[in-house]
UniProtKB/Swiss-Prot annotation:
One of its GO terms (biological process) is L-methionine biosynthetic process from homoserine via O-succinyl-L-homoserine and cystathionine. Substrate binds at residues 163, 192, 249. It catalyses: L-homoserine + acetyl-CoA = O-acetyl-L-homoserine + CoA. This is Homoserine O-acetyltransferase. Belongs to the MetA family. Its EC number is 2.3.1.31. The record marks 111 as: Important for acyl-CoA specificity. Keywords: Acyltransferase, Amino-acid biosynthesis, Cytoplasm, Methionine biosynthesis, Transferase. The keyword Calcium does not apply. The record marks 192 as: Important for substrate specificity. Pfam families: HTS (PF04204). InterPro entries: Class_I_gatase-like, HST_MetA, MetA_family.
Amino acid sequence: MPIIIDKDLPARKVLQEENIFVMTKERAETQDIRALKIAILNLMPTKQETEAQLLRLIGNTPLQLDVHLLHMESHLSRNVAQEHLTSFYKTFRDIENEKFDGLIITGAPVETLSFEEVDYWEELKRIMEYSKTNVTSTLHICWGAQAGLYHHYGVPKYPLKEKIFGVFEHEVREQHVKLLQGFDELFFAPHSRHTEVRESDIREVKELTLLANSEEAGVHLVIGQEGRQVFALGHSEYSCDTLKQEYERDRQKGLNIDVPKNYFKHNNPNEKPLVRWRSHGNLLFSNWLNYYVYQETPYVL
């Protein structure tokens, strides 16, 4: 089934070229189907790339989704044209009286700041509070996961001596959890972080369950409130070349950045990346949508 997006959204062309089934809002209105309402709070500066990454994954399920893109009203985005935001995005104020089946909160390149130093922190707190009663399930990614764990449960983040950067092996820690349905016991996921949350802090919160972690990269998947809140510290949504682009960008800035681990063939940045996370990335998003959104949401929101 398709994802419903604006016919002029640039990501639409990318998805159609990859045979991802997309549908315009105009066509969807002619069908007698109650599509799932999914909001994506896009905190990334690379808005269009993030749109394509997430839409690619949530569009790869049998469910019909009506996608709403959100940006922060209290933050000025400098890396995306204002016309793009005006045309395709809403703010929290626009939708705060609505209910949603699912919400995705992305990462953001602000992790070296304390949460309270982030210029849109107060607005984000209001959105996270709103999600507790107006969203069936919320998926938090990377910094968004750190923010959610901190706001909802008081779980702190800690600076790392070296950036966790690359593709890492993870182990499933809880069997028979629907979010991990179909997962191998060992699976890969990308990480790109300067900070971490610690397993010991997660285990001190009785409402949280650690689902998967990595010896090298630490905590990856955590679930809370019977699936109403899902936290992914890694980036299973990343495209094949995302880590490569981050690596090359930082080198051009003159930063001392290591080659992303377990990513390039023969660990040689002149060779192509090896994608080892795509199947489990698709499983993660499809399981979230099926078991924690579709199966749990009421027909009338």
